[in-house]
Amino acid sequence: GPDSTALLDILRRLAPTFPFNLHVAHLHHGIRGEEADRDMAWVAHLAETWGLPFTGKRVDVPTIAEKEGLSEEEAARQARYGFLGLVAAEVKADSVAVAHNADDQAETVLMHFLRGAGLAGLRGMLPKIQLGAYHFLGNTPTIDRNIALIRPLLGVSRSMIEAYCETHDLEPRL
């Protein structure tokens, strides 16, 4: 979507100036059928167009959720973070960047409030955390390196991200 596309474009533009390499990773959750197939093909094509390495994987989140006794949303999150952590370890990355934005943050805080979370839950997502075993499904292999999960767009609104995409002629899949 616009968030991930904008983040990838921003990072690829910054990469020549700063000491980091990019590797694009995309997890197909096995939920949205052919639409999700097209999403993964589009991400792979975008990575190739921009000369970036790509790793994609397909999983069956509904089956994982049933087997692990999780909601589909939680199973998808754990599968995604486990996949990103494994790819990061494989390519010897120190960080994984995800495209959560200010609108996602507001939604998270509101959901936590409505569920009766205490003050810690009301703080929302942090801009940087260490990926740990509690982020992954139980069958995720152990990752033997410290990998940070960073959210560079956490203070940026979705409307600003969409404006960025328009300004830079990016056409994200919606």
PLM regions and their residue ranges:
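Core alpha/beta nucleotide-donor-binding catalytic domains of modification enzymes
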Residues: P2-L174
